Amino acid sequence: MPKFKVTRGASNREKHAPLAEQILAGNAVRAGTREKRRGREVEEEEEYVGPRLSRRILQQARQQQEELETDHGAGDRSAPPRERATRLGPGLPQDGSDEEDEEWPTLEKAAKMAGVDHQAEVIVDPEDERAIEMFMNKNPPVRRTLADIIMEKLTEKQTEVETVMSEVSGFPMPQLDPRVLEVYRGVREVLCKYRSGKLPKAFKVIPALSNWEQILYVTEPEAWTAAAMYQATRIFASNLKERMAQRFYNLVLLPRVRDDIAEYKRLNFHLYMALKKALFKPGAWFKGILIPLCESGTCTLREAIIVGSIITKCSIPVLHSSAAMLKIAEMEYSGANSIFLRLLLDKKYALPYRVLDALVFHFLAFRTEKRQLPVLWHQCLLTLAQRYKADLATEQKEALLELLRLQPHPQLSPEIRRELQSAVPRDVEDGGVTME
């Protein structure tokens, strides 16, 4: 008997059921092949609009809304007019490389949601302020800005135009092309009115130029808005080398911060965020902002509190902090030095013994001081005793206890003495300690 041939796919087909079962099954609902369709619908729903297309859609919607408001007037007359962002021309590319330019509005909203008021006036104790003024430099050096240095270089070029300058004395600055001057004068107009939005491309390429200081001088940094200063700090901190970033901090950012505090008795939120953003390069921040502020001898209590709050809130590498503490401990004393040292000590770093020795010598230098030391000085000494009492040698502890006798404070000196006497010196072996 020949073999019965089965066609392809016949094995998967269902055999015919009896007629009664077919009639009963006909009344039931069958799912059919809807599963595949559902899978396709889910895949279609998961597709989303790309970020570039979303920005274009929002831009077109915003332009149409502005056209309607211009033709028919705003719907709500009682609402205050919305502050427009500075437009920099239609020719700028709308790619995703400039998304970070919108960072400031996000920061402002976050600050409002958190209830943080960086513009609140700093409360200063009058007694502490008078005590700090006693240790201020009576003949402070003249502060130099970027404009002063550029003008000095231009004057040198005019007086020595026919002289071939050696590598030691430097080189004369070249004349700028008139077209370049025209471009950056336009950038200056934008930065003087900048509130939010994207920055000109010509401004973003300044860190890559060899004569970036001269170009920056054309834009007149002293006339920038606070928001423009924040964006400039973000760009220069990210793209300049540490040495060049230090010059920008010292010649542009620091004078602006000090002038703003002196005028308004508080610091603008944009400038405060600029100081925090500058910590992207901690070495340049210490060399360009903190150390010059202490060396000036004119740092006020309000300036020290505001700048010191950034030290408290931000994470700083231990090597940079140790070097800064060593430098502050060895320089001439001013009241603000105690604030910065206390804040750095409160971060509880594992400091090298060289830094601890310099801090001890810093305090021992006041054994013959005739002026009344401020409370901030005693607080700094108390912080040193609390954080690093186990890292001090026996001779250092004895010298500090003698210092407390010469420079006493009715409330803080007993606490400092108790901290020093409760710890085992670092030069005493564990085996030599006897338990009573």
Curated annotation (Swiss-Prot):
<feature type="modified residue" description="Phosphothreonine">
    <location>
        <position position="155"/>
    </location>
</feature>
<feature type="modified residue" description="Omega-N-methylarginine">
    <location>
        <position position="40"/>
    </location>
</feature>
<comment type="similarity">
    <text>Belongs to the bystin family.</text>
</comment>
<feature type="modified residue" description="Phosphoserine">
    <location>
        <position position="413"/>
    </location>
</feature>
<dbReference type="InterPro" id="IPR007955">
    <property type="entry name" value="Bystin"/>
</dbReference>
<feature type="modified residue" description="Phosphoserine">
    <location>
        <position position="97"/>
    </location>
</feature>
<comment type="function">
    <text>Required for processing of 20S pre-rRNA precursor and biogenesis of 40S ribosomal subunits.</text>
</comment>
<dbReference type="GO" id="GO:0001829">
    <property type="term" value="P:trophectodermal cell differentiation"/>
</dbReference>
<feature type="compositionally biased region" description="Basic and acidic residues">
    <location>
        <begin position="32"/>
        <end position="41"/>
    </location>
</feature>
<feature type="region of interest" description="Disordered">
    <location>
        <begin position="1"/>
        <end position="103"/>
    </location>
</feature>
<dbReference type="GO" id="GO:0005730">
    <property type="term" value="C:nucleolus"/>
</dbReference>
<dbReference type="GO" id="GO:0005737">
    <property type="term" value="C:cytoplasm"/>
</dbReference>
<dbReference type="GO" id="GO:0005654">
    <property type="term" value="C:nucleoplasm"/>
</dbReference>
<protein>
    <recommendedName>
        <fullName>Bystin</fullName>
    </recommendedName>
</protein>
<dbReference type="GO" id="GO:0000462">
    <property type="term" value="P:maturation of SSU-rRNA from tricistronic rRNA transcript (SSU-rRNA, 5.8S rRNA, LSU-rRNA)"/>
</dbReference>
<comment type="subunit">
    <text>Binds trophinin, tastin and cytokeratins.</text>
</comment>
<feature type="modified residue" description="Phosphoserine">
    <location>
        <position position="166"/>
    </location>
</feature>
<keyword id="KW-0963">Cytoplasm</keyword>
<keyword id="KW-0539">Nucleus</keyword>
<feature type="modified residue" description="Phosphoserine">
    <location>
        <position position="54"/>
    </location>
</feature>
<feature type="compositionally biased region" description="Basic and acidic residues">
    <location>
        <begin position="70"/>
        <end position="86"/>
    </location>
</feature>
<dbReference type="Pfam" id="PF05291">
    <property type="entry name" value="Bystin"/>
</dbReference>
<dbReference type="GO" id="GO:0045177">
    <property type="term" value="C:apical part of cell"/>
</dbReference>
<dbReference type="GO" id="GO:0072089">
    <property type="term" value="P:stem cell proliferation"/>
</dbReference>
<dbReference type="GO" id="GO:0001701">
    <property type="term" value="P:in utero embryonic development"/>
</dbReference>
<keyword id="KW-0488">Methylation</keyword>
<dbReference type="GO" id="GO:0005694">
    <property type="term" value="C:chromosome"/>
</dbReference>
<keyword id="KW-0690">Ribosome biogenesis</keyword>
<dbReference type="GO" id="GO:0001825">
    <property type="term" value="P:blastocyst formation"/>
</dbReference>
<keyword id="KW-0597">Phosphoprotein</keyword>
